[in-house]
Amino acid sequence: MAHPIPVVVNGATGKMGRETIKAIAAADDVTLVGAIARSADVQGQDIGEIVGLGPLEVPVTNDLEGMLCLASQEREVPVVVDFTHPDCIYDNVRKAIAYGVRPVVGTTGLNNEQLQELAEFAEKASVGCLVIPNFSIGMVLLMQAAIQASRFYDHVEILELHHDQKADAPSGTAIKTAQMLAELGKTFNPPKVTEKETMPGARGAVGPENIRIHSVRLPGLIAHEEVIFGAPGEILTLRHDTMDRSCYMPGVLLAVRKVRQLTGLIYGLDRIP
């Protein structure tokens, strides 16, 4: 019988981290070996007790390198799932790769230069690394539907809405959506008039191939995206709504199971072979 995949969760006490802990505890083929969080008031506490599962015998620590070192000594190839912050994610991933721990990254905010550097680092180390802007299967299907629709429409804009604790804007998911549309090789939104913003930023950020992205941050939201296509006489709106973070867990577990079989960096759930 195969041994379960050892998993460390970084950002374990955050909203996504807590859901990930629960998903790992419920799965038979993965096992939690580490929980990392920065908050001083949770250090040493059992992460199972914190998330409401009862004892898991995994104490919370803020020592990332120490935990990566311990995980690297496991019998099976270990994985670290990272839901932390844009300010530290680049360094977190480099440290994980250096220890041979396979990163599954749900934290957005990495720029293109950082992604390229991490890709080269992972390739050189022969380590798989997955950077996933959105773990929702439904969101992947929305992106695929947008690609199909974009063949018939020349005008498109993206609206993304998230909770007010999200640090980066626009979201990694919205950027990924725009990038996928841009890969079709067509330029969107040919100008109709000479625009003048009386308030800077009113028309949103201009992404690849002239695709505008608009960001909303409000309490009460979780994660939502609309891809809006326009043509004379009609509007087509594709929308995905996250009602509960549990919808991300099938994608998280898929990434954990797949990353150990890969070499180099892959960006996006849809690109996992």
UniProtKB/Swiss-Prot annotation:
Catalytic activity: (S)-2,3,4,5-tetrahydrodipicolinate + NAD(+) + H2O = (2S,4S)-4-hydroxy-2,3,4,5-tetrahydrodipicolinate + NADH + H(+); (S)-2,3,4,5-tetrahydrodipicolinate + NADP(+) + H2O = (2S,4S)-4-hydroxy-2,3,4,5-tetrahydrodipicolinate + NADPH + H(+)
Main location: cytoplasm
Residue ranges of the TM segments: none
PANTHER family: 4-HYDROXY-TETRAHYDRODIPICOLINATE REDUCTASE 1, CHLOROPLASTIC-RELATED, DIHYDRODIPICOLINATE REDUCTASE
Family matches, as Gene3D superfamilies: Dihydrodipicolinate Reductase, domain 2, NAD(P)-binding Rossmann-like Domain
Pathway noted in the entry: Amino-acid biosynthesis; L-lysine biosynthesis via DAP pathway; (S)-tetrahydrodipicolinate from L-aspartate: step 4/4
General function of this protein: Catalyzes the conversion of 4-hydroxy-tetrahydrodipicolinate (HTPA) to tetrahydrodipicolinate.
The protein, known as: 4-hydroxy-tetrahydrodipicolinate reductase
One CC-aspect GO term: cytosol
Location(s) in or outside the cell: Cytoplasm
Keywords: Amino-acid biosynthesis, Cytoplasm, Diaminopimelate biosynthesis, Lysine biosynthesis, NAD, NADP, Oxidoreductase
Assigned EC number: 1.17.1.8
Catalytic residues (positions): H162, K166
Chain sites annotated for binding (S)-2,3,4,5-tetrahydrodipicolinate: H163, G172, T173
UniProt-listed HAMAP family: DapB
GO-annotated biological processes: diaminopimelate biosynthetic process; lysine biosynthetic process via diaminopimelate
Entry binding sites for NAD(+): G11, A12, T13, G14, K15, M16, G106, T107, T108
InterPro entries, per the entry: DapB_C, DapB_N, DapB_N_CS, DHDPR_bac, NAD(P)-bd_dom_sf
Domain of life per record: Bacteria
Enzyme class: oxidoreductase
GO molecular function: 4-hydroxy-tetrahydrodipicolinate reductase; NAD binding; NADP binding; oxidoreductase activity, acting on CH or CH2 groups, NAD or NADP as acceptor
Keyword DNA-binding among UniProt keywords: no
Family to which the UniProt record says this protein belongs: Belongs to the DapB family.
